């Protein structure tokens, strides 16, 4: 899909509500410069009750001097609705029951979920942590957890424990992943009885963003545990501070954000960008703005 630098830029956006805070335009602009792909990437605020109309309006839109709309990222609260708009849905999006990427193909739309593979690549590439053979605790059983559980399982950990305040929701998520979770221990537990310690602890809840205490006991951690909050920036700070206070290594979800974006870019353009310089630039930007 590569084109000359003089080609009219094909258009992509991130759709959400809210969406003004999104770092996706910065990330994809760096990917475009790095790869020479002629794209333009923006933000679109969709009404809470008008997501489908918003997507269809963008897909059909034209702009003078620019190429057609080719796809979009989808963020909260619309990920659960986006897959229903597609003619074809990837296996990982079907398993997650949510999609964060749409590609506008001539014969219909294609939906995918790149969150989980983005997390796995961040853990293994940027954190240098081997998931294979590890004991993993996934805190939460909502949409964020559903998006990452399948790719986590496919990275061959020894055990995955899903802990959630509402235990039945965790049980439903585990049941849905039984088919891909062969050859490992895949279980659910209440938040106050997780067991442990674990090698990898992932917080998919919004506890940090809400300023709440981490919803599990520090006994789930040990020296050498890698603890990750899927949030980034100040929103992840309470979890990171808690994890470090208990002797764990800790990181936020910024690497996941960049890696899932790279997977989407590859899906759209057929070329995979180098994520490390983009992640470094984004961390520098966040350090300067404090956001």
What kind of region is each of these model predictions?
Residues 3-127:
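Phosphate/diphosphate ligand-binding glycine-rich loop within oxidoreductases
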Residues 5-8, 131, 154-156, 216-225:
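Short, conserved loop/helix-junction motifs that constitute active-site signature segments
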Residues 16-18, 111-116, 123, 127, ...:
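Glycine-rich adenosine-cofactor-binding loop
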Residues 104, 116, 223-275, 281:
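Rossmann-fold NAD(P)-binding glycine/threonine-rich loop
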Residues 154-159, 245-249:
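Conserved S-adenosyl-L-methionine
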Residues 155-180:
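NAD(P)-binding Rossmann-fold cofactor-contacting core
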Residues 180-251:
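Rossmann-like adenosine-cofactor binding region
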Residues 276-291:
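A short, charged, Gly/Pro-tolerant segment at domain boundaries
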């Amino acid at each position: 899909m590569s084109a000359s630098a003089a080609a009219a830029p094909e258009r992509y956006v991130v759709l959400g509500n809210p969406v003004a805070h999104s770092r996706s335009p910065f990330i994809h602009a760096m990917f475009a410069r790095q790869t020479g792909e002629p794209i333009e990437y923006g933000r679109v605020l969709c009404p809470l009750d008008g997501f489908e109309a918003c997507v269809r309006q963008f897909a059909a839109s034209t702009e003078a001097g620019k190429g057609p709309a080719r796809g979009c990222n989808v963020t909260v609260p619309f990920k659960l609705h986006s897959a229903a708009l597609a003619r074809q849905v990837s296996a990982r999006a079907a398993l997650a029951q949510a999609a964060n990427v749409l590609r506008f193909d001539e014969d219909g739309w294609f939906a995918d979920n790149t969150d989980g593979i983005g997390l796995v690549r961040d853990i293994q590439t940027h954190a240098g942590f081997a998931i294979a053979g590890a004991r993993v605790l996934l805190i939460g059983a909502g949409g964020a957890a559903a998006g990452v559980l399948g790719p986590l399982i496919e990275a061959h950990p020894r055990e995955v424990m899903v802990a959630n305040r509402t235990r039945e929701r965790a049980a439903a998520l585990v049941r849905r992943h039984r088919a891909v979770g062969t050859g490992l221990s895949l279980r659910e537990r209440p938040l106050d009885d997780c067991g442990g310690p674990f090698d990898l602890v992932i917080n998919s809840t919004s506890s940090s963003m809400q300023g709440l205490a981490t919803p599990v006991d520090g006994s789930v951690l040990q020296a050498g545990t890698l603890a990750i909050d899927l949030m980034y920036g100040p929103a992840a700070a309470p979890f990171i501070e808690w994890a470090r206070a208990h002797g764990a290594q800790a990181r936020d979800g910024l690497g996941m954000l960049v890696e899932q974006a790279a997977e989407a870019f590859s899906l759209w353009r057929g070329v995979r960008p180098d994520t490390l310089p983009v992640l470094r630039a984004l961390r520098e930007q966040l350090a300067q703005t404090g956001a």
